[in-house]
């Protein structure tokens, strides 16, 4: 899940940053994706505000599937938030059997339609025998500490930090 949290910083979406990591039974990475503009399109050329941006953005789960290598049969996915119905279908169709989902909420309003979508996702999981596991995010800071300690040990923490700061600056954030 730590890798998913790090990957979501790459998203240029101004409201919601999601990421998805697909791994095999031995936890080897098969695919990585984050929500963002379609491939080959200049990021500056597309709308960044809803609802227009939705025509140009791809969800992290489908990007992870598109960017994957090898079979996803029997794989596990780590998603920073709850999957939508379209992404759930894509994951099931590609053989994902376990989904860990995290605390990042999408900016979708809590409407009867979004409640129905969540019920549909849970129903699909049940019907397809896909295990849904809510990631206990209360300890996510410990995960980040482990990741940063590892990156520091490998001597690449400053480079990763610089990439995150650069991403935040593009989004108008502060260091």
What is each model feature region?
Residues 1-175:
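Zinc-dependent deaminase catalytic domain
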